[in-house]
């Protein structure tokens, strides 16, 4: 069976969709966003296709497509949809699969279930995407604690933003996690520039080895 990796973030807007596109492209794999909230602009799946170079056949269809760009539990209620979290099972594919969550770990899927509940059931390794800006130490360490409390394997932390040696170092040391690398902000953001930024910041081998802890 090919590797399956869950990408989550310390909060909304950290850059995990761009990171997921880079990772899925580098792995020449598949991508899946279980629940898409917000359809008026480019969806996360469309962004990944545009930036990763993966064809539509490599992007697994969303289980739920909800109109409003809010937390999935509320978006579903506004659409009159009931999310059946038990039906959300990570697909098996013939290439590595990157699964992207929504917002942070405790974003609710329903009034009773969070994304972290889903991750704990899947038992798949998680890559935590974290900013390098002010405030990220607390957010990152809380997220690491939450994953460990549910016995979810942490593949490592992927930083996104400008280099911040002290901030990155204290998160890695206090969180006792692997630093996978850092994805710099890219301007202009294109398939080619993202591919190069990922290659400069990461070792793709770290995402396919058994290193989670």
From Swiss-Prot:
GO terms for molecular function: ATP binding; dethiobiotin synthase activity; magnesium ion binding. One of its GO terms (cellular component) is cytosol. Keywords: ATP-binding, Biotin biosynthesis, Cytoplasm, Ligase, Magnesium, Metal-binding, Nucleotide-binding. Its cofactor is Mg(2+). The active site is at residue 33. Disulfide bonds: none annotated. InterPro entries: DTB_synth_BioD (IPR004472), P-loop_NTPase (IPR027417). It comes from Nitrobacter winogradskyi (strain ATCC 25391 / DSM 10237 / CIP 104748 / NCIMB 11846 / Nb-255). This is ATP-dependent dethiobiotin synthetase BioD. Substrate binds at residue 37.
């Amino acid at each position: 069976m090919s590797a399956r990796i869950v990408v989550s973030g310390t909060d909304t807007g950290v850059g995990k969709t761009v990171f997921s596109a880079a990772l899925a492209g580098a792995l020449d794999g598949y991508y899946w966003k279980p629940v898409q909230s917000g359809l008026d602009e480019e969806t996360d799946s469309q962004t990944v296709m545009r930036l990763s170079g993966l064809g539509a056949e490599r992007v697994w269809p969303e289980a739920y497509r909800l109109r409003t760009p809010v937390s999935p539990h509320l978006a579903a209620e506004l659409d009159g949809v009931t999310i059946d979290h038990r039906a959300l099972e990570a697909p098996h594919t013939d290439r590595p699969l990157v699964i992207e969550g929504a917002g942070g770990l405790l974003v609710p899927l329903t009034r009773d279930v969070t994304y972290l509940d889903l991750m704990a059931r899947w038992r798949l390794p998680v890559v935590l995407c974290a900013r390098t800006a002010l405030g990220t130490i607390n957010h990152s360490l809380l997220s690491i604690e939450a994953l460990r409390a549910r016995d979810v394997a942490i593949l490592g932390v992927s930083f996104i933003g400008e280099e911040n040696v002290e901030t990155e170092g204290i998160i890695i040391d206090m969180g006792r996690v692997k630093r996978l690398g850092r994805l710099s902000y890219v301007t202009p953001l294109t398939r080619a520039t993202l591919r190069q930024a990922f290659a400069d910041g990461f070792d793709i081998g770290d995402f396919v080895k058994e290193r989670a802890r």
